[in-house]
Amino acid sequence: MSATKKTYSSTTSAKSKHSVRVAQTTADAALEAVYEMSGDSGDSFDYSKSVGQSAESVPAGAVTAYLQRMQREGLIQNFGCMVAVEEPNFCVIAYSENASEFLDLIPQAVPSMGEMDVLGIGTDIRTLFTPSSSAALEKAAATQDISLLNPITVHCRRSGKPLYAIAHRIDIGIVIDFEAVKMIDVPVSAAAGALQSHKLAARAITRLQALPGGDIELLCDTIVEEVRELTGYDRVMAFKFHEDEHGEVVAEIRRMDLEPYMGLHYPATDIPQASRFLLMKNRVRLIADCYASPVKLIQDPDIRQPVSLAGSTLRAPHGCHAQYMGNMGSIASLVMAVIINDNEEYSRGAIQRGRKLWGLVVCQHTSPRTVPFPLRSVCEFLMQVFGMQLNLHVELAAQLREKHILRTQTLLCDMLLRDAPIGIVSQTPNIMDLVKCDGAALYYGKRVWLLGTTPTENQIKEIADWLLEHHNDSTGLSTDSLADANYPGAHLLGDAVCGMAAAKITAKDFLFWFRSHTATEVKWGGAKHDPDEKDDGRKMHPRSSFKAFLEVVNKRSPPWEDVEMDAIHSLQLILRGSFRDIADSDTKTMIHARLNDLKLQGVEERNALANEMSRVLETAAAPILAVDSRGMINAWNAKIAQVTGLPVEEAMHCSLTKDLVLDESVVVVERLLSLALQGEEEQNVEIKLKTFGTQTTERAVILIVNACCSRDASDFVVGVFFVGQDVTEQRMFMDRFTRIQGGEKTTVQDPHPLMRPSFDGDEFGRTFKRNSALGGLKDHATGSVERLDLYLRRAEECMEVMETIPSPKFNNKQCQYLAGKLKAVLQSASLFLRISHHEHHELGASIDMGRHVEIFKLLLALAKEIESFIQGCCKDEWIKAAMTLTNVSEYVSSMGFNLELCKIAFCKSCAASGSLTLDQIEVICKDEAEVVKRNASIDVDTLFAKVIYDLTEKTLSSDQNDLAIYLLQRLKRAKPILPSFSSRPSWWNFYDDWSFSEKFFQWIQITGSLGSGSSATVEKAVWLGTPVAKKTFYGRNNEDFKREVEILAELCHPNITSMFCSPLYRRKCSIIMELMDGDLLALMQRRLDRNEDHDSPPFSILEVVDIILQTSEGMNYLHEKGIIHRDLKSMNILVKSVKVTKSEIGYVHVKVADFGLSKTKDSSTRYSNQTWNRGTNRWMAPEVINLGYESTEGEISFDGKVPKYPLKSDVYSFGMVCYEVLTGDVPFPEEKNPNNVKRMVLEGVRPDLPAHCPIELKALITDCWNQDPLKRPSFAVICQKLKYLKYLLMTGFSSYQDSYPSTEEPS
């Protein structure tokens, strides 16, 4: 069915869609009539042929009868019975023939006369059920919406048989469907029904809400998986209805032996409009057995028409549909409606206003199957959630598509300003980028410019002539079938050109977009040719549907969507304004020529000229106005009345400067008037006029005007008239460019010390527009920056969305905060990647690998922080999908560890040391690089580590110290992925290799002391050119040293301190670790010292949650590895990049450290009585203090035996750390005696949490402090709760309202 439109308004588009549905209903009725005439068996019914002929005219009466038959056929399915009753007396007015048997009214033995129950017209149905069941029915009938209480559990009075009663109201009473309650079902009461549905659907809903935004395909795949798990059907599919009402299978999960239907397209008649209407009212449709004989209804003869079964759960399938199911081997089905918002202005009725049927989720089974009503209610609830999630995805996709179109329009407009009109077809992007199409053309001045797949130039001219002849009254035309639009030359265009959108830009010029026929885009995995297939397309079957669909869409393109037509219309307006310049110029030339000929003699001649001038002014395509010597309007043509919304009669005698001009243009207009009245005419001056009437909500009207003097017969100036050009649309787009350029200029020129380095490049890759943060970096060639530019472009789009469109839960300040952090990440990426490319081109330049590593680490940390925040805080918001489109951490990680980049680094390092030539290193890396090129599935990180690993082995035994230093540094960073290699040299754990360690130790330079503890001292040092921390243990065979080295060697996490190496020199055990800025306790102390109010806490609540969240993530990683820390406290938590200012909020990087007392959970070694409970009493769990041990049942016993350390003791310590971060003080600060602290802990005493602690956090800490370790949450649970709390704080839904962190440095 073709869709041909002559206008682009949304209302007309909605009406057109309504017309399509009406026409489709007619086609449904025609197809049904053909089926009915084929006989009961339907053997003579040719499905494929009938679909093609169903569009023929059908009498209105036949359509009405068809719709009535669909709703009032008087047949139900036999897995239940139906009774219709009057209100309020419950007298039966209709019932199904099987009702007596189903309700156990037919006794097994002959009853006495007093015991016989009778069901007939007029029977009070309450007498057939127990008193409690009757009361339940009466209570349900008294409610306004009876369906909210479904199912109502009732029991037959005679047998006590339990039944589900599903009730709904119709025009003449209440229809009650009765279904059997199976023994495996768990009957739920009316009050508990909704709650039970929520519980059963909870897992599926959680999974749906956790999906990333913007991926409709993944969302559909997930819903079919969850529905199949709930219902157990053989096949579950998700159908989507397209704009032309045809359907497509977009997701499928099936039994392996069933034929796939994924990708199947089927004609709109396969699911009639009447069935779709019924699904909007009754959103879950069950067919238990398509072969079962339907049951007839018996109704009161006084009722004038059959009882409506539109809302009945038992309505029988129509014969045509039942045969279709049987042909495809689907005996039973469960169909669920997927309904989303419909923003179209035009609607068919109140029931459907604002909502539309997006598609269906369809379950099919190869044998009879009945799903109990409570489970169907669960599915219906799940579909509601799915519809809400889908609506968010659809709206996001529409926003992104509109944003892309707007950006393209902006660029096209800019091209017009520079090269009109040819720039929109000769430059990039062009008009093909505006909407999805296969080709486009510009027909202007009888010349043709072609792009992509289009008709020939002569055919374009013929189409233009046809439009001017048959559609000259419209501004454009869109159709998915030129043949159906009655274009006579359509058969000459072939399959390559079927659909067309045309926009008239002048009286005789057009823009065209073309599309090929739909079949070129349609693929179905099941549509394979089978020589043995006997189905010739006559019978109803998915294969026949697919064939019929291809026949229907033959010579037809995909339809033009409203958003695409809006984009075309917008461009049309811009172009018409641009082309109007020529007409305006002609008008101005004509007017000036007439004015210069005022030397004409004779009154009659002058009057004729005046009349002609009035006609020219009134009919001119340009806005024209005139004023007298006082500035009062005395001429106001139709065009300016149109653009301002002010009618001529209201404009006359208004003051131009006081009533019509915006304040910002008053001075300009007054100057123009003054000069013109003195005889001096100005040209090309911009003025802004007010808007009136229906135009008041729009922007000001911007005109470029020429001021012309109006003279009388004596040649005196008596007034001024203005000939203008409307440039409002162009100025809107130029203002958008100006704002973007202004932001870019601020970034480049802003001298703020916190501004990150940024620069841009020209078409040759040279740097320009550097800001002060880039310092004295010289211009250099950056190599290929296409990927980086794409990355930045995508991110800028995201930031524009965030900064300009307020979220329902995020205010503008919060969005700008996130956008600022993302911009910092991107600028760091720009610096890192461009410098790397620069050094690639200048191999002789000296390098600072430490700088590269630090920039990359900072970049990756910030990127992951933003991405993690988005995942945790924006579950159901468009903002999550918009930001995750940038794939920040994935992109940065892949670029940071790119093999090519690392290979260049090896070459530069070796060249600097002079130990190996570049050619030698190239040979070493070449094979690995070729493997990556041949097989992209190989993990680049692993390959990178392998290359370093091999190079290190080649250099350790030589005198190539510089290369060895560099390679060891890189190798230690890559070490966590190396254990997968089968062989490792002895020097790997080189703290056991004295000869090498002694040589290695010479590379460490001590620069200062950091502190000391009971088992080790920590010094500040420089190792391999990088500042590090050197931890030296007391004693030669220190168990703490070996334990810590063994644990650190297996750890790799952003919230766990990293070990570079562990050299042993002169029997001194040492660990070389990353250098941090200090511990958490010292940071809190510095914060408290700086606070003017010494009673205020050291951190804001948002910082508190961020710090303990990072700590919990590090501890969760340890526990997943089976490692117990045993000494978790603020002194053993290190921080990085801290300045002790408010601007650091959200940037405190936390890492868990000090593993000297740590132990693996599964270790068979038990601690000695002297060492097992080492730690600090204030942070010790009660079971640790009490010398408990883990029994085989997992419980803690306190009898003094030597213990295994319980895992949940770390959770208790974590609770104490939370107290520290909240208050800035140690636990139990008033108590100085350690023994008293132990006693208090064992008695269940805990520190008092401060008043500013949010309720959610207070509950979590209390759980961590629980006396019973088995009742404490795991760190995995703690992480989830803290992420959610962070979300609540950021969105303002927490019990605590903290100020949002400032991104400005305090003065």
From Swiss-Prot:
Annotated compartments: Cell membrane
Catalytic activity: L-seryl-[protein] + ATP = O-phospho-L-seryl-[protein] + ADP + H(+); L-threonyl-[protein] + ATP = O-phospho-L-threonyl-[protein] + ADP + H(+)
Pfam families in UniProt: GAF, PAS, PAS_2, PHY, PK_Tyr_Ser-Thr
One GO BP: detection of visible light
Keyword hit for Ligase: no
The protein's assembly and partners: Homodimer.
The protein, known as: Light-sensor Protein kinase
Organism: Ceratodon purpureus (Fire moss)
Protein's gene: PHY1
